[in-house]
Amino acid sequence: MIILPAIDIKQGKCVRLYQGRFEKSSVVAESPALTAKSFENDGAKYIHVVDLDGALEGEIINLDAVKSIVQVTSVPIELGGGIRNIKVVEKLINIGVKRIILGTAALKDKEFTREAIKEYGKSIAVGIDAKDGYVAVNGWLNVSKINYIEFAKIMEDMGTEDIILTDISKDGTLKGPNFDMLKKLQENVNCNITASGGIKDLDDLIKLKEMNIYGAIVGKAIYSEKINLKEAIAVIEKR
Protein backbone atom coordinates (compact mmCIF):
# COMPACT_ATOMS: atom_id res chain seq x y z
CA MET A 1 0.00 0.00 0.00
CA ILE A 2 1.19 3.48 -0.86
CA ILE A 3 0.87 6.29 1.68
CA LEU A 4 0.20 9.57 -0.10
CA PRO A 5 0.77 12.67 2.05
CA ALA A 6 -1.67 15.40 1.04
CA ILE A 7 -1.09 18.99 0.04
CA ASP A 8 -4.27 21.06 -0.37
CA ILE A 9 -3.48 24.44 -1.93
CA LYS A 10 -5.56 27.55 -1.36
CA GLN A 11 -4.26 30.98 -2.41
CA GLY A 12 -0.79 29.50 -2.83
CA LYS A 13 -0.58 28.04 0.69
CA CYS A 14 -1.08 24.60 2.23
CA VAL A 15 -4.37 24.38 4.09
CA ARG A 16 -6.59 21.74 5.66
CA LEU A 17 -10.37 21.73 5.47
CA TYR A 18 -12.88 20.28 7.90
CA GLN A 19 -15.53 18.06 6.27
CA GLY A 20 -14.80 19.74 2.95
CA ARG A 21 -16.01 23.15 4.11
CA PHE A 22 -13.98 25.94 2.56
CA GLU A 23 -14.90 28.41 5.28
CA LYS A 24 -13.33 26.02 7.79
CA SER A 25 -9.85 26.03 6.26
CA SER A 26 -6.70 26.59 8.26
CA VAL A 27 -3.21 27.28 6.93
CA VAL A 28 -0.83 24.47 7.89
CA ALA A 29 2.22 25.56 5.86
CA GLU A 30 3.21 28.59 3.81
CA SER A 31 5.08 26.77 1.05
CA PRO A 32 3.62 23.78 -0.84
CA ALA A 33 7.04 23.16 -2.44
CA LEU A 34 8.90 22.99 0.88
CA THR A 35 6.16 20.79 2.30
CA ALA A 36 6.48 18.42 -0.66
CA LYS A 37 10.26 18.35 -0.20
CA SER A 38 9.86 17.39 3.46
CA PHE A 39 7.49 14.57 2.43
CA GLU A 40 10.09 13.36 -0.05
CA ASN A 41 12.75 13.43 2.67
CA ASP A 42 10.47 11.30 4.85
CA GLY A 43 10.29 8.65 2.15
CA ALA A 44 7.01 9.44 0.36
CA LYS A 45 6.70 7.53 -2.93
CA TYR A 46 3.76 9.63 -4.18
CA ILE A 47 2.23 12.99 -3.18
CA HIS A 48 -1.45 13.89 -3.44
CA VAL A 49 -2.08 17.54 -4.39
CA VAL A 50 -5.40 19.37 -4.68
CA ASP A 51 -5.95 22.86 -6.07
CA LEU A 52 -8.85 23.89 -3.83
CA ASP A 53 -9.37 27.22 -5.58
CA GLY A 54 -9.41 25.31 -8.84
CA ALA A 55 -12.07 22.92 -7.57
CA LEU A 56 -14.35 25.89 -6.88
CA GLU A 57 -13.53 27.88 -10.01
CA GLY A 58 -13.51 25.00 -12.46
CA GLU A 59 -10.01 25.78 -13.74
CA ILE A 60 -6.46 25.42 -12.42
CA ILE A 61 -5.70 28.45 -10.23
CA ASN A 62 -2.55 27.45 -8.34
CA LEU A 63 -0.47 26.36 -11.33
CA ASP A 64 2.68 28.13 -10.08
CA ALA A 65 2.53 26.26 -6.78
CA VAL A 66 2.06 22.96 -8.63
CA LYS A 67 5.03 23.73 -10.90
CA SER A 68 7.20 24.54 -7.89
CA ILE A 69 6.34 21.17 -6.30
CA VAL A 70 7.26 19.32 -9.49
CA GLN A 71 10.52 21.27 -9.76
CA VAL A 72 11.79 20.69 -6.21
CA THR A 73 10.90 17.01 -5.80
CA SER A 74 11.55 13.85 -7.76
CA VAL A 75 8.50 12.18 -6.21
CA PRO A 76 5.56 11.70 -8.60
CA ILE A 77 2.50 13.79 -7.80
CA GLU A 78 -1.17 13.37 -8.54
CA LEU A 79 -3.27 16.49 -8.94
CA GLY A 80 -6.97 17.21 -8.69
CA GLY A 81 -9.14 20.32 -8.59
CA GLY A 82 -10.63 22.18 -11.54
CA ILE A 83 -9.39 19.95 -14.35
CA ARG A 84 -12.19 20.13 -16.89
CA ASN A 85 -10.75 19.74 -20.40
CA ILE A 86 -8.18 17.74 -22.35
CA LYS A 87 -5.88 20.72 -23.01
CA VAL A 88 -5.41 21.23 -19.27
CA VAL A 89 -4.69 17.52 -18.81
CA GLU A 90 -2.07 17.70 -21.57
CA LYS A 91 -0.52 20.84 -20.07
CA LEU A 92 -0.25 19.27 -16.61
CA ILE A 93 1.25 16.04 -17.94
CA ASN A 94 3.78 18.12 -19.88
CA ILE A 95 4.91 20.06 -16.79
CA GLY A 96 5.49 16.78 -14.97
CA VAL A 97 2.30 15.86 -13.10
CA LYS A 98 2.24 12.06 -13.04
CA ARG A 99 -1.44 11.41 -12.44
CA ILE A 100 -4.50 13.58 -13.06
CA ILE A 101 -7.58 13.26 -10.86
CA LEU A 102 -10.92 13.92 -12.51
CA GLY A 103 -13.80 14.61 -10.13
CA THR A 104 -16.61 16.93 -11.20
CA ALA A 105 -15.68 16.51 -14.87
CA ALA A 106 -15.92 12.72 -14.60
CA LEU A 107 -19.55 13.05 -13.53
CA LYS A 108 -20.58 15.94 -15.75
CA ASP A 109 -18.57 15.45 -18.93
CA LYS A 110 -18.40 11.80 -19.95
CA GLU A 111 -17.02 12.63 -23.41
CA PHE A 112 -14.00 14.46 -21.97
CA THR A 113 -13.46 11.74 -19.37
CA ARG A 114 -13.57 9.00 -22.01
CA GLU A 115 -11.11 10.98 -24.18
CA ALA A 116 -8.74 11.56 -21.24
CA ILE A 117 -8.73 7.88 -20.26
CA LYS A 118 -8.23 6.80 -23.88
CA GLU A 119 -5.39 9.27 -24.41
CA TYR A 120 -3.60 9.06 -21.06
CA GLY A 121 -4.73 5.72 -19.56
CA LYS A 122 -2.92 5.03 -16.31
CA SER A 123 -2.24 8.75 -15.84
CA ILE A 124 -5.95 9.36 -15.18
CA ALA A 125 -7.60 8.63 -11.83
CA VAL A 126 -11.20 9.33 -10.89
CA GLY A 127 -11.89 11.04 -7.59
CA ILE A 128 -15.21 10.02 -6.06
CA ASP A 129 -16.17 12.37 -3.26
CA ALA A 130 -19.22 11.01 -1.48
CA LYS A 131 -21.63 12.47 1.03
CA ASP A 132 -24.12 10.03 2.58
CA GLY A 133 -23.27 7.64 -0.25
CA TYR A 134 -23.91 10.11 -3.08
CA VAL A 135 -21.36 11.77 -5.35
CA ALA A 136 -20.59 15.44 -4.61
CA VAL A 137 -19.23 17.88 -7.20
CA ASN A 138 -18.01 21.48 -7.65
CA GLY A 139 -15.66 21.54 -4.68
CA TRP A 140 -18.14 19.39 -2.72
CA LEU A 141 -20.74 22.15 -2.76
CA ASN A 142 -23.36 20.16 -4.68
CA VAL A 143 -24.48 16.59 -4.05
CA SER A 144 -25.78 14.59 -7.02
CA LYS A 145 -28.35 11.79 -7.01
CA ILE A 146 -25.80 9.23 -8.18
CA ASN A 147 -24.69 6.55 -5.71
CA TYR A 148 -20.91 6.25 -5.38
CA ILE A 149 -20.84 2.54 -6.31
CA GLU A 150 -23.01 3.06 -9.36
CA PHE A 151 -20.69 5.87 -10.47
CA ALA A 152 -17.56 3.78 -9.80
CA LYS A 153 -18.91 1.00 -12.04
CA ILE A 154 -19.55 3.49 -14.84
CA MET A 155 -15.99 4.80 -14.51
CA GLU A 156 -14.54 1.28 -14.48
CA ASP A 157 -16.49 0.44 -17.65
CA MET A 158 -15.02 3.58 -19.19
CA GLY A 159 -11.54 2.22 -18.53
CA THR A 160 -10.25 3.92 -15.40
CA GLU A 161 -7.95 1.80 -13.26
CA ASP A 162 -7.65 4.12 -10.26
CA ILE A 163 -10.39 5.42 -7.98
CA ILE A 164 -9.84 7.74 -5.04
CA LEU A 165 -12.73 7.51 -2.59
CA THR A 166 -13.30 10.34 -0.14
CA ASP A 167 -16.01 10.26 2.49
CA ILE A 168 -16.60 14.00 2.90
CA SER A 169 -18.11 13.61 6.36
CA LYS A 170 -14.79 12.10 7.53
CA ASP A 171 -12.43 14.53 5.81
CA GLY A 172 -10.26 16.51 8.22
CA THR A 173 -12.01 15.04 11.28
CA LEU A 174 -9.37 12.52 12.43
CA LYS A 175 -12.23 10.11 13.20
CA GLY A 176 -11.00 7.26 11.04
CA PRO A 177 -11.85 6.38 7.43
CA ASN A 178 -15.16 4.88 6.34
CA PHE A 179 -14.06 1.24 6.16
CA ASP A 180 -17.56 0.02 5.23
CA MET A 181 -17.76 2.32 2.21
CA LEU A 182 -14.32 1.20 1.06
CA LYS A 183 -15.18 -2.48 1.50
CA LYS A 184 -18.39 -2.12 -0.52
CA LEU A 185 -16.48 -0.38 -3.28
CA GLN A 186 -13.87 -3.15 -3.29
CA GLU A 187 -16.63 -5.72 -3.66
CA ASN A 188 -18.07 -3.97 -6.71
CA VAL A 189 -15.09 -2.87 -8.81
CA ASN A 190 -11.63 -4.20 -9.66
CA CYS A 191 -9.89 -0.81 -9.75
CA ASN A 192 -7.02 0.30 -7.53
CA ILE A 193 -8.76 2.03 -4.62
CA THR A 194 -7.17 4.85 -2.66
CA ALA A 195 -8.77 5.79 0.66
CA SER A 196 -9.11 9.45 1.58
CA GLY A 197 -10.68 11.23 4.54
CA GLY A 198 -10.45 10.75 8.27
CA ILE A 199 -7.27 8.65 8.58
CA LYS A 200 -6.08 9.38 12.11
CA ASP A 201 -3.30 7.00 13.15
CA LEU A 202 -1.05 4.09 12.29
CA ASP A 203 -3.75 1.58 13.23
CA ASP A 204 -6.02 2.98 10.49
CA LEU A 205 -3.21 2.57 7.97
CA ILE A 206 -2.52 -0.99 9.09
CA LYS A 207 -6.21 -1.88 8.76
CA LEU A 208 -6.33 -0.39 5.24
CA LYS A 209 -3.22 -2.36 4.31
CA GLU A 210 -4.86 -5.55 5.62
CA MET A 211 -7.88 -4.78 3.42
CA ASN A 212 -5.53 -4.69 0.40
CA ILE A 213 -6.35 -1.06 -0.30
CA TYR A 214 -4.01 0.34 -2.97
CA GLY A 215 -3.33 3.74 -1.40
CA ALA A 216 -4.05 5.90 1.65
CA ILE A 217 -4.13 9.69 1.51
CA VAL A 218 -3.08 11.27 4.78
CA GLY A 219 -3.36 14.98 5.47
CA LYS A 220 -4.44 16.34 8.82
CA ALA A 221 -2.94 13.42 10.78
CA ILE A 222 0.52 14.35 9.46
CA TYR A 223 0.12 18.09 10.00
CA SER A 224 -1.22 17.59 13.54
CA GLU A 225 1.57 15.06 14.25
CA LYS A 226 -0.79 12.15 14.91
CA ILE A 227 1.08 10.22 12.24
CA ASN A 228 4.84 10.32 11.72
CA LEU A 229 5.12 9.89 7.95
CA LYS A 230 8.60 8.36 7.96
CA GLU A 231 7.64 5.83 10.64
CA ALA A 232 4.30 5.02 8.99
CA ILE A 233 5.92 4.34 5.61
CA ALA A 234 8.49 2.04 7.25
CA VAL A 235 5.82 0.10 9.16
CA ILE A 236 3.50 -0.33 6.17
CA GLU A 237 6.34 -1.38 3.84
CA LYS A 238 7.36 -4.14 6.27
CA ARG A 239 3.87 -5.63 6.57
Curated annotation (Swiss-Prot):
Active site: D8, D129
E.C. number(s) listed in UniProt: 5.3.1.16
Keyword Cytoplasm among UniProt keywords: yes
InterPro entries per record: Aldolase_TIM (IPR013785), His_biosynth (IPR006062), HisA_bact_arch (IPR006063), Isoase_HisA-like (IPR044524), Isoase_HisA-like_bact (IPR023016), RibuloseP-bd_barrel (IPR011060)
Family named by the database record: Belongs to the HisA/HisF family.
Subcellular location: Cytoplasm
GO molecular function: 1-(5-phosphoribosyl)-5-[(5-phosphoribosylamino)methylideneamino]imidazole-4-carboxamide isomerase activity
Keywords: Amino-acid biosynthesis, Cytoplasm, Histidine biosynthesis, Isomerase
Reactions mediated catalytically: 1-(5-phospho-beta-D-ribosyl)-5-[(5-phospho-beta-D-ribosylamino)methylideneamino]imidazole-4-carboxamide = 5-[(5-phospho-1-deoxy-D-ribulos-1-ylimino)methylamino]-1-(5-phospho-beta-D-ribosyl)imidazole-4-carboxamide
GO biological process, one term: L-tryptophan biosynthetic process
Source taxonomy: Bacteria, Bacillati, Bacillota, Clostridia, Eubacteriales
Source organism of the structure: Clostridium acetobutylicum (strain ATCC 824 / DSM 792 / JCM 1419 / IAM 19013 / LMG 5710 / NBRC 13948 / NRRL B-527 / VKM B-1787 / 2291 / W)
Assigned GO CC terms: cytoplasm
Domain of life: Bacteria
Keyword Ribonucleoprotein in record: no
Pathway(s) the chain acts in: Amino-acid biosynthesis; L-histidine biosynthesis; L-histidine from 5-phospho-alpha-D-ribose 1-diphosphate: step 4/9
Name this polypeptide is given: 1-(5-phosphoribosyl)-5-[(5-phosphoribosylamino)methylideneamino] imidazole-4-carboxamide isomerase
